[in-house]
Amino acid sequence: MFLKKYLPAIPVIIILAMMIFTDSCANTTTPPSGGPKDTIPPVITKIEPLPGSINVPRHKTKLLLQFNEYVTIKDPKSLFLSPPLEKAPKYKLQGKGVLITFECDLDSAKTYTLDVTNAIGDNNEGNMFPGYTLVFSTGDRIDSMMVTGTVQDCNTLKPLKGATVMLYKDHADSALFLRRPDAAVKTDEWGYFCIRNIQDTVYRLYAIIDENNNNIYESETEKVAFFDTLITPVVKVNDTLPELQKYDMKDTASCLARKSEYELNIFKEKPTKQLIVNKERIGERTAYITFMAPYAQIDSIWIKGVPSDQLITQFNIMQDSLEIWVNDPKEQPDTFFLNVNYMKTDSLGLLNSFTEEIKLVKPKKSLAAKSSKKDMKKEDTLCVFTIDAKPETVEQYGFVFEFKYPLVEDAFDSLTFRYVNPKQQEYTEKYSIVQDSLNLRKYVLRPNVEMLPGYEYFVKVPHRKFKDINGFYNDSTEVKVTLPNDDKLSTLSLNLINVNNKYIVDLLNEKRDKIMRSYVIDKDSTLPFPYLKSGKYSIRITEDVNRNGVVDTGNLLEHKQPEKVLFYKLEDGTVLINIPEMTELEQNIDLAEMFK
């Protein structure tokens, strides 16, 4: 009965047929040929102890999986025992089988599952065994409940393969940091998990990216997810359930047909320990320091021998990285002694004022330049900058100037902005310049005229209009951009209603790895997405609850989930919007309904 219930069907007929029709080596009169390539994966022929066995010995436990051909272990980490022990299972190839042993005793009266999905392949062609989960107990019964769900990245909402999903009967969050779970499993390529043969009791549900495979959460280096409330299994194990089958991950229909009870969004917590973790002098007058935790609190900062009014500093948006420049064109010493007075975490885990001296040595390239000028490039004596102006988005983002070093002199009013219409008529127009609030080296030029498709726009920068901290002036340049005028391009308009918070709205490409256009809104709005090529796109909307312009992460001990990120779903449940050529689409989105 146990064999029928727990052991997958073995294609005996196929094996017998292969044996009957295989030519005998003794009777052949011609040399053997290569023959067709073997594409059939290994098949289990024997399991010890039998699936569903009870009262399995705790001490020196051995499990044997016998196959119809010689096999090898492709990925030892995929031999996963639940509940996990302090040390991972050991394996040994034994004939056509795999012998699995454990370095420590199993617990008494406990149901175990050994999953071997993506672990075993045949010895010759590498055909992968589709997977199997062996269930056994050291007690006199087999636990019979199960839970299912999916794990995804909190920002991209892409499924995460290989996350460790954990169940704890200890409901204190500290358990995740201190001991291994009462049951666990790894997610597949769809981010899907099924923790089977567990007790009928109340659990905490977590997932982690277990970097060191110790089945314990380490917040400084690993990502985590948690379900907001306690859970109780409601589904009993039945080997006919789709959720318990082993599917080819390319079988989309079957994989999507599996029911998912819980959804976990995995995130990286902010480090709680504050200290300087990295520092580097990257140029004659440039250096940076980085902190372990965001929002570093700096009281004062100085470099020995450098007047305070010559020091320029800038934090990044998360305030965990600080750029430092010395505003002095003369040659600087080979070593800077940077002093930073900041709030540092002490041995008791408390923040205290601390002054740290950091030695910053000039990079070798700069030292070599002292004795040799022959390799000096033109850009090494110029005020270097770029102008970013993409045809598809320039009317929204403007012409973005970014300088390599901070400016000490500028004459933005000396620039020329002109445009040529389709009739080849040329006009000069006024413009505005705004310095970026987060990057003092970035400036945005916006014309005082609406930018139109098919028009050519020019920004001309004359010679010696900008001077940086090195004392270098700029070279002259001109950029040209033409707004797209292709009749085949399409437009998507989003009508967003019931906007009761601040939201970040992104249009992404099909792979979700490129933002086509982005908006930040805090009221009902109509957002245009013009100049779209035919293809599939998705709409990602992030709820910026604290209105800081950043997608804030979660906090496990505070039971705070990361700020919610959702993809707009069509009526059929898909997130991809198919946009044909020469189309104007309009979509209404009720944000209050979407984020309720």
Spans of features found by a protein language model:
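N-terminal targeting or signal-anchor segments and their processing/structural boundaries
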Residues: 2-596
